[in-house]
């Protein structure tokens, strides 16, 4: 089986490494010449995962057509803001009747489209039943280290979901399939916004009580917007919901939590981003999530405060203070 992976960041590389470990022939799309040479000659992604040796069956190419054309499965893992442009480029030579697996997370700025909506808008209908979406608590480094990991595979087609589930499942990587595409996407996108808030809390020196509060109320916000969009609420208790939320809010490898932590310590967003090698999706997603909540008429207090901190220069200390001063409410999933 030949597999093309679009995106040579840490997560795309980790998924490619997993599939190559299973014996599949994997080609990774990469824009950087030195990175391509390092992967092909030394089996190391020198830009994103310099401390790990990659399988010999994983190679890299700068030619997107070479990566995609004639493959038996496509894995798409670019930053969500780059997805539309990439799909418009590849749809002329994208193979038909093969699984297309998206691992991108986010809500497109301006259009407010989920990743599935981008795929279904940009690709002809003949591809739609072959689309699936992978999400769950899975740091790239730990996948490459073969740490036991679980994720969700969502697809509107059970046949596609089960096929992708079988291809990805391995000794250290277990997958659960679900038809709830919207729920998996909403959980995977909005957890990054909540992780920014959790990082701010840690950076300000608050304790685990505060982090637990943010995770709990963050899940409430994710569930509210998910239900409004038609998701199954049970999805948010699974790997792509609570599982990913806990990992991203608590794990030291979390880019979004790290950005929040540094903001809490007093750095500016510009200072933080200037030294980052990977994309923190939560920054762009916060803007889209805020606009989507306004459009749908849903109160999302944590998201609103993170938005004010990122885009209106609100002091992180004031963010936490204002969250604690909100009107008292009855406990419940949707309040």
From Swiss-Prot:
Single GO MF annotation: glycerol-3-phosphate dehydrogenase [NAD(P)+] activity
GO-annotated cellular components: cytosol
Catalyzed reaction equations: sn-glycerol 3-phosphate + NAD(+) = dihydroxyacetone phosphate + NADH + H(+); sn-glycerol 3-phosphate + NADP(+) = dihydroxyacetone phosphate + NADPH + H(+)
EC number: 1.1.1.94
Record-annotated membrane-spanning stretches: none
A Pfam family this chain is assigned to: NAD_Gly3P_dh_C
Enzyme class: oxidoreductase
Signal peptide start and end residues: none
GO annotation terms (biological process): carbohydrate metabolic process; glycerol-3-phosphate biosynthetic process; glycerol-3-phosphate catabolic process; glycerophospholipid metabolic process; phospholipid biosynthetic process
Pathways per UniProt: Membrane lipid metabolism; glycerophospholipid metabolism
Compartments (UniProt record): Cytoplasm
Binding-site residues for sn-glycerol 3-phosphate, renumbered to this chain: 105, 136, 138, 191, 244, 254-256
Keyword annotations of the record: Cytoplasm, Lipid biosynthesis, Lipid metabolism, NAD, NADP, Nucleotide-binding, Oxidoreductase, Phospholipid biosynthesis, Phospholipid metabolism
List of catalytic residues: 191
Superkingdom, taxonomy of origin: Bacteria
Disulfide bonding pattern of the chain: none
Residues given in the record as NADPH binding sites: 10-11, 31, 105, 140, 255, 279, 281
Function: Catalyzes the reduction of the glycolytic intermediate dihydroxyacetone phosphate (DHAP) to sn-glycerol 3-phosphate (G3P), the key precursor for phospholipid synthesis.
Family of this protein: Belongs to the NAD-dependent glycerol-3-phosphate dehydrogenase family.
Protein name, per record: Glycerol-3-phosphate dehydrogenase [NAD(P)+]
Organism, scientific name: Leptospira borgpetersenii serovar Hardjo-bovis (strain JB197)
Source lineage: Bacteria, Pseudomonadati, Spirochaetota, Spirochaetia, Leptospirales
Gene: gpsA
């Amino acid at each position: 089986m030949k597999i093309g992976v679009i995106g040579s960041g840490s997560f795309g590389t980790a998924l490619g490494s997993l599939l190559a470990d299973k014996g599949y022939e994997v080609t990774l799309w990469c824009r950087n010449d030195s990175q391509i040479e390092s992967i092909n000659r030394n089996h190391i992604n020198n830009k994103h995962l310099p401390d790990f040796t990659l399988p010999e069956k994983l190679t890299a190419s700068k030619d997107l057509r070479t990566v995609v054309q004639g493959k038996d499965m496509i894995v798409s893992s670019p930053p969500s803001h780059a997805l539309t442009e990439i799909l418009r480029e590849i749809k002329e030579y994208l193979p038909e009747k093969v699984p297309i697996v998206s691992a991108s997370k986010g809500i497109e700025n301006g259009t407010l489209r989920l990743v599935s909506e981008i795929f279904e808008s940009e690709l002809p209908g003949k591809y739609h039943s072959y689309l699936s979406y992978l999400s769950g608590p899975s740091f790239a480094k730990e996948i490459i280290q073969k740490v036991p990991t679980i994720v969700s595979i969502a697809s509107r087609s059970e046949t596609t979901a089960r096929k992708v589930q079988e291809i990805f499942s391995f000794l250290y990587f277990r997958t659960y399939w679900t038809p709830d595409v919207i729920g998996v996407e909403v959980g995977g996108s909005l957890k990054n916004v909540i992780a920014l808030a959790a990082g701010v809390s840690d950076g300000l020196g608050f304790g685990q009580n505060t982090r637990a509060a943010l995770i709990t109320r963050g899940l409430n916000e994710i569930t509210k917007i998910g239900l409004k969009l038609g998701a199954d609420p049970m999805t948010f208790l699974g790997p792509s919901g609570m599982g990913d939320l806990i990992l991203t809010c608590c794990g030291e490898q979390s880019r979004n939590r790290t950005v929040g932590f540094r903001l809490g310590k007093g750095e500016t967003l510009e200072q933080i981003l200037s030294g980052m090698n990977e994309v923190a999706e939560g920054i762009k997603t916060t803007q889209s999530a805020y606009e989507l909540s306004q459009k749908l008429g849903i109160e999302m207090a944590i998201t609103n405060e993170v938005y004010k901190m990122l885009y209106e220069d609100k002091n992180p200390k004031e963010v936490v203070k204002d969250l604690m001063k909100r009107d008292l409410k009855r406990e419940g999933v949707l309040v």
